[in-house]
Amino acid sequence: MTLESIMACCLSEEAKEARRINDEIERQLRRDKRDARRELKLLLLGTGESGKSTFIKQMRIIHGSGYSDEDKRGFTKLVYQNIFTAMQAMVRAMDTLKIPYKYEHNKAHAQLVREVDVEKVSAFENPYVDAIKSLWNDPGIQECYDRRREYQLSDSTKYYLNDLDRVADPSYLPTQQDVLRVRVPTTGIIEYPFDLQSVIFRMVDVGGQRSERRKWIHCFENVTSIMFLVALSEYDQVLVESDNENRMEESKALFRTIITYPWFQNSSVILFLNKKDLLEEKIMYSHLVDYFPEYDGPQRDAQAAREFILKMFVDLNPDSDKIIYSHFTCATDTENIRFVFAAVKDTILQLNLKEYNLV
């Protein structure tokens, strides 16, 4: 055997080994890609109180195990605390807005409620139940409630205060709707994974308040879809953190930032224009043109208002090739979210298959 033939033989052995290693690497990459395809990361973004946490609760109801009686019982204290927080906010606003109580005895009731340390509330009993009922029935407090855009008040206030007898019952167990309406500011990051058609959807909810946003940064890797929530009803409200800044302007600024982040170049963007039910109520007495002078549509027209708001957000997209998928939602309405998320899921799966060249 000549030296050349021995070398050729060795080379072919080396080449074979190199090819084998290369094939193994290719196979592993394909496996990794396939496994990554099985888990889709959905990042829920939006300013504070846009409805992100409610959306996650709906995923648990629609695609998870829901809320057992034991789970619901865990929300009882939070419902009580929400009621006290709301009434305290209105009592304080009565002073700020200089609205008098119609009934003299409600001044004492207001003082009683004002002195409660909400963090320590774990029951809902008299004299507090009667005090809060009496206050809620006072025309002064009702006027204060009607002027709620001038201070910070939870969207669920009316829902709970109109149902005090049920909540004050000693055998009270929160309903699914009570659970959906409870307001607890999200601090930190909440993940909710659920399985659909053998794909894991990992939904990530990050705090919306400004102080929470700096914690988002490490969530940004491998995001399949950005789901951005906007509260339609916030067009006439100011921020919790800054009372001279319009909430919708803040939401627009955040959306603009998010869609231009290089991290999200390959992520699909789904825009949820949420709280459509509250917009329908509010548009009857609070005119969009007073806050967005460029609006030239009809007054008291929820359809025209929401189309205008949608266009404001879509126009922030600088990339004409990037489609923004949009849906009008009411996050506290399970059937609405079931319907909307079915469409969103199909969109995400289709886009994901396209990315992996499977369609």
UniProtKB/Swiss-Prot annotation:
It comes from the Eukaryota. Palmitoylated by ZDHHC3 and ZDHHC7. Palmitoylation occurs in the Golgi and participates in the localization of GNAQ to the plasma membrane. Histaminylated at Gln-209 residues by TGM2. GO terms for cellular component: caveola; cell body; cytoplasm; dendrite; Golgi apparatus; heterotrimeric G-protein complex; membrane; nuclear membrane. Its EC number is 3.6.5.-. It is a lipid-anchor. Keywords: Cell membrane, Golgi apparatus, GTP-binding, Hydrolase, Lipoprotein, Magnesium, Membrane, Metal-binding, Nucleotide-binding, Nucleus, Palmitate, Transducer. Guanine nucleotide-binding proteins (G proteins) function as transducers downstream of G protein-coupled receptors (GPCRs) in numerous signaling cascades. The alpha chain contains the guanine nucleotide binding site and alternates between an active, GTP-bound state and an inactive, GDP-bound state. Signaling by an activated GPCR promotes GDP release and GTP binding. The alpha subunit has a low GTPase activity that converts bound GTP to GDP, thereby terminating the signal. Both GDP release and GTP hydrolysis are modulated by numerous regulatory proteins. This is Guanine nucleotide-binding protein G(q) subunit alpha. It comes from Rattus norvegicus.
